[in-house]
């Protein structure tokens, strides 16, 4: 219900703002949200969810006991009937850090199967280089698949039931269709 309430705010705007990234075919009459940016500012539920013991326990097992949660995050939407692909990228390009012990965690708010554009990951790429995310000298937030030596047909979809959690290293190459 919380996510539905936040998404309903899209019917009041014509273009993306500091809270919502809209799909290209969005209209006020037919709201289409691609992403809720900084969801912890939209509703307390998101901050509480990311700090739940069931989440932090899993992250602590992977990283050790002294984890820090980064304020912010986002809620990526893959709504039925529409939903833009996310180009191949590494999260590291968006927020580089001074150490390599950084993970991205996702909690599925709905069931995710092959029909609704799951996250696709390239196993083992977190051990490789950080790829270029520029086009014509400007940061574009995506890799050029033709310029890297990766076989994207080997991508693995991350599917699961609502409430499932995905965790990946921020250097792992990933995207969605």
Please describe what each predicted stretch is.
Residues 91-102, 153-154, 160:
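A short beta-loop-beta micro-motif enriched in histidine and acidic residues
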Residues 85-93, 167-176:
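Histidine-centered catalytic micro-motifs
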Residues 112-175:
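Double-stranded beta-helix
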């Amino acid at each position: 219900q919380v996510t539905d309430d936040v998404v309903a705010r899209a019917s009041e705007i014509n273009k993306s703002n500091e809270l919502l990234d809209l799909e290209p075919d969005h209209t006020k009459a037919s709201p289409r949200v691609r992403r809720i940016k900084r969801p912890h500012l939209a509703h307390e539920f998101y901050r509480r969810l990311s700090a739940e013991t069931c989440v932090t326990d899993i992250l602590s097992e992977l990283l050790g006991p002294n984890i820090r949660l980064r304020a912010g995050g986002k809620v990526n939407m893959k709504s039925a009937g529409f939903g833009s692909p996310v180009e191949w990228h590494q999260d590291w390009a968006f927020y580089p850090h001074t150490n390599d012990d950084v993970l991205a965690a996702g909690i599925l708010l709905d069931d995710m199967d092959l029909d609704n554009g799951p996250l696709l990951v390239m196993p083992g790429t977190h051990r490789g280089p950080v790829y270029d995310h520029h086009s014509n000298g400007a940061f574009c937030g995506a890799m050029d698949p033709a310029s890297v030596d990766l076989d994207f047909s080997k991508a693995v979809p991350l599917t699961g039931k609502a409430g499932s959690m995905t965790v990946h290293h921020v250097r792992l190459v990933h995207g969605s269709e």
